């Protein structure tokens, strides 16, 4: 899983700036259904800016696609000793999948009957996890009530 991502050219990436760029990009789509996106916190990591943009774009796109109208997708960054943690939290429409780990499997789509008007091959989260792993990071998902939280942990250098 992720062998195709051989090397990562690492430069300093301002994640807050990158996530705010993505927020601006996705806002028109979110506005159509009364959804909002917030970004709080800061953090700089060593990584490939384009690859990280793709990973976070996948996460944000899914958050907007699979959340009910008039809800907020909250992105929170926090630094600890050697890492930046990014939490992307949104309300789920329908039932949260029983096994969240499966969301990262290639071609897996959680109960397609819930997502009758969505497109996708089920590769986005698998690719996202590969990108995060190529950066020496971790990606996980957990349920908190009606919300799902995707957590990304990336090294600062």
Summary of predicted features, one role per range:
Residues 95-108:
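Short conserved segment of the HATPase_c
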């Amino acid at each position: 899983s992720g062998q195709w991502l051989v090397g990562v050219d690492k430069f300093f990436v301002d994640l807050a700036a990158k996530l705010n760029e993505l927020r601006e990009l996705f806002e028109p789509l979110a506005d159509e259904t009364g959804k909002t996106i917030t970004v709080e916190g800061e953090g700089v990591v060593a990584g490939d800016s384009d690859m990280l943009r793709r990973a976070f774009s996948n996460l944000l796109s899914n958050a907007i696609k699979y959340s009910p109208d008039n809800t907020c997708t909250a992105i929170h960054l926090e630094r600890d000793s050697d890492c930046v943690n990014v939490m992307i939290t949104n309300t789920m429409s329908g039932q949260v999948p029983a096994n969240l780990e499966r969301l990262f499997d290639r071609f897996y789509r959680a109960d397609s009957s819930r997502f009758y008007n969505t497109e996708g091959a089920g590769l986005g989260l698998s690719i996202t996890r590969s990108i995060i792993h190529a950066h020496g990071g971790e990606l996980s998902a957990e349920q908190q009530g009606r919300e799902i939280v995707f957590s990304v942990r990336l090294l600062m250098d």
